């Protein structure tokens, strides 16, 4: 087996296969410019509103959703096998429809609020189009299973008043669905989107800036210097670097690519069994979602729902995160002792640094 670090192309292939959010298509120059414009705009918008105050809830969330949906349909193909092709014609249509639906909510937010949850035919039309687009975006970026489950519940909400027995609801139909899922902040423009449009994206932006400044390489060098020559050193490097990388990235797949492309070949080079090297990196990278301050989007939604400051959620996550990585670290040490896996030799340690 090769012990050389993964090439960037191979790492991208692995991400596209196992992580839907990294299955990006190859963009032409002008499409890439459009995506960059929307990305820059929403980044500056989030920083501005964080510093000088947010827009009304529906405007803040609809503008954020507008940019996110346009970027999604231009960047992520409908199927992974199309990732090397250009943007399909229907994706331009989806991006334009997303732009129009979200712009409608942004411009008419006062009129929508003044109607107190009573939708008209235009609202219902926009709701249907936007709901379909969100389901398709979820299928591409998260999983088809989540879109299917959501679709089942939407169908149930529509036909609930004609369902038999205990499954029957008091009312159903498109009007009631639009009233609750589009006109008031309980559905599409609810608190999960509000959390993403305020806190989550700021932390993701901060994480991207740190990674772009070379923080990932610095973390690996520090971990290598601390534990590289101790018993089970290369595996401990994976644990420490993954824990530290988790503070700037809440995604397990990104953690694996950020640290595993270095630590897995290093462990194999030092005589570690390939399955042991892979298992250590998988466990260490998965735990990155437990480490503050990012901790994944679910943490921010949790803070929104239970009504406590995010700082308290973050502090509460310190102890479980520490215990998790301490247990992985001790397990690696004991397993390395049992297998007779020593640390790196001085010349290997110096060359890697």
Short names for language-model regions:
Residues 220-288:
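Hydrophobic transmembrane alpha-helices that form the pore/transport pathway of multi-pass ion
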Residues 57, 83-86, 112-205, 351:
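Hydrophobic transmembrane alpha-helices of multi-pass solute/ion transporters
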Residues 6, 104-108, 112, 256, ...:
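Transmembrane-helix bundle segments that line or gate the permeation/cavity pathway
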Residues 1-114, 124-128:
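Conserved, well-structured core domains of diverse proteins
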Residues 153-157, 243, 285, 304, ...:
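Residue-level recognition of pore/gate-forming positions within transmembrane alpha-helices
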Residues 62-67, 194-204, 311-327:
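Alpha-helical transmembrane segments
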Residues 73-83, 134-139, 212-218:
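C-terminal ends of transmembrane helices
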Residues 2-32, 315-351:
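Long, contiguous bundles of hydrophobic transmembrane helices that form the permeation core
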């Amino acid at each position: 087996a090769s012990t050389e670090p993964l090439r960037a192309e191979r790492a991208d292939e692995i991400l596209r296969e196992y992580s839907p959010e990294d299955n990006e298509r190859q963009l032409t120059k002008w499409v890439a410019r459009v995506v960059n414009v929307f990305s820059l705009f929403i980044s500056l918008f989030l920083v501005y509103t964080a510093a000088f105050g947010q827009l009304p809830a529906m405007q803040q969330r609809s503008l954020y959703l507008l940019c996110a949906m346009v970027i999604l349909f231009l960047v992520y193909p409908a199927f992974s096998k199309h990732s090397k092709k250009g943007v399909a014609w229907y994706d331009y249509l989806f991006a334009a429809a997303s732009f129009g639906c979200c712009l409608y909510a942004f411009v008419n937010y006062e009129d929508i609020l003044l109607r107190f949850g009573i939708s008209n035919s235009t609202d219902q039309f926009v709701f249907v189009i936007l709901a379909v687009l969100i389901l398709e975006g979820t299928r591409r970026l998260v999983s088809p299973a989540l879109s299917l489950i959501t679709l089942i519940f939407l169908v149930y909400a529509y036909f609930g008043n004609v369902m038999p027995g205990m499954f029957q609801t008091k009312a159903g139909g498109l009007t009631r669905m639009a009233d609750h899922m589009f006109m008031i902040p309980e559905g599409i423009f609810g608190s999960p989107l509000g959390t993403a449009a305020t806190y989550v994206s700021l932390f993701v932006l901060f994480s991207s800036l740190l990674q772009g400044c070379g923080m990932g390489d610095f973390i690996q060098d520090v971990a290598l210097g601390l534990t590289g020559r101790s018993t089970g050193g290369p595996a401990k490097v994976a644990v420490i670097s993954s824990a530290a990388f988790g503070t700037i990235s809440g995604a397990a797949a990104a953690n694996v690519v950020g640290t595993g492309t270095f630590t897995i070949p290093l462990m194999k080079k030092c005589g570690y069994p390939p399955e042991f090297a892979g298992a250590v990196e998988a466990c260490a990278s998965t735990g990155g979602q437990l480490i503050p301050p990012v901790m994944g989007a679910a943490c921010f939604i949790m803070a929104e729902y239970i009504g406590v400051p995010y700082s308290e959620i973050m502090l509460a996550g310190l102890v479980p995160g520490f215990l998790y990585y301490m247990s992985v670290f001790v397990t690696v040490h004991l397993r390395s002792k049992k297998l007779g896996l020593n640390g790196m030799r001085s010349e290997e340690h110096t060359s890697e640094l």
